[in-house]
Amino acid sequence: LVYDKPFVIDELKAFENHAEVKLIYEVMNPIDSYPFKFRIELLYKLTKESLSLKMNVINLDDKKLPFTLGWHPYFKSYDLNQSLIKFNSTKKIKCDKNNITIDTEEFSSKMPLSLNKKIFDDAFILEHPSIEFYTPEYDLVLTSSEKENFLQLYTPINTNAIAIEPMTGVSDSFNN
């Protein structure tokens, strides 16, 4: 996990129509629980209408580097009960009491899915790498360029927000 690690600004560019920042995090002295040397490069590009993130993971070791990428953005809505989400999936991930993946089950739902009074802490196998989110104030589309895509949805209690989390693997990826 690198969510709490210090990334270094490698490049910062501003243009007339967009801005870019490249962040780097590198591990040359690995820890016991993840004994691999690697470098992560994040390139954010911001325009008036979009935010793109390109992630590059570089193996700096002489052995294979197992990893899964996940991005955990939260999106606020004036009224989440009036919001909708749309994604293409026929499989939901089944987890044990510790949220460790144990199996899959069939998933079927009319799309777009209303978020009215819905509580989520669920993961899905995506058949198409696009997720659409519609709120009373704005709409957005999240896409991925990966071959295999997963989606984690999480709604914190008593908030008008949802975490829409695109991932390249499931939780506990080392064992799955």
Features from the language model and the residues they span:
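Hydrophobic residues positioned within well-ordered beta-strands of beta-sheet architectures
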Residues: 21-23, 40-42, 53, 69, ...
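Short coil/turn motifs at secondary-structure junctions
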Residues: 28, 49, 60-62, 76-78
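Active-site pocket scaffolds in enzymes
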Residues: 140-176
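Active-site scaffold segments
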Residues: 52, 72-74, 161-167
